[in-house]
């Protein structure tokens, strides 16, 4: 193999390792058997949620995982592998891929990594059941607003009682 090809592959390993280090979550799938139309729809959905989806050779993925400190992830790089990286939303890749897999039997989730820790297929599927980032933020906001709303209602009730008494 020529030195130019080796250098190019080394650059690719470095680039993938950097993506793995920077990613909030990584989901590895076996997309063998998806039609071109299904793959196009899947890629569009992932892109809409700012999730990067790539089919990368297993040898490159193994080396990149080792370089990124995710050595245990290397064991799932068997057979055709596609990888979804998300830097912002931890839940998005798992949720989109899991929802898509329900309608496309050919797509199989293999495992991944969450916040730099290797995750099994079961953990990725559990992550997929959580609401997305916006949903979690709205839940948090409603929990934070509830005490303030209750105090405001209590103050209003006291004011109404004083008006009625006067």
Curated annotation (Swiss-Prot):
One of its GO terms (molecular function) is structural constituent of ribosome. InterPro entries: Ribosomal_uL10, Ribosomal_uL10-like_sf, Ribosomal_uL10_bac, Ribosomal_uL10_bac_type, Ribosomal_uL10_CS_bac. It comes from the Bacteria. GO terms for cellular component: large ribosomal subunit. GO terms for biological process: translation. The keyword Ribosomal protein applies. Pfam families: Ribosomal_L10 (PF00466). Keywords: Ribonucleoprotein, Ribosomal protein, RNA-binding, rRNA-binding. Belongs to the universal ribosomal protein uL10 family. Part of the ribosomal stalk of the 50S ribosomal subunit. The N-terminus interacts with L11 and the large rRNA to form the base of the stalk. The C-terminus forms an elongated spine to which L12 dimers bind in a sequential fashion forming a multimeric L10(L12)X complex. Forms part of the ribosomal stalk, playing a central role in the interaction of the ribosome with GTP-bound translation factors. This is Large ribosomal subunit protein uL10. The gene is rplJ.
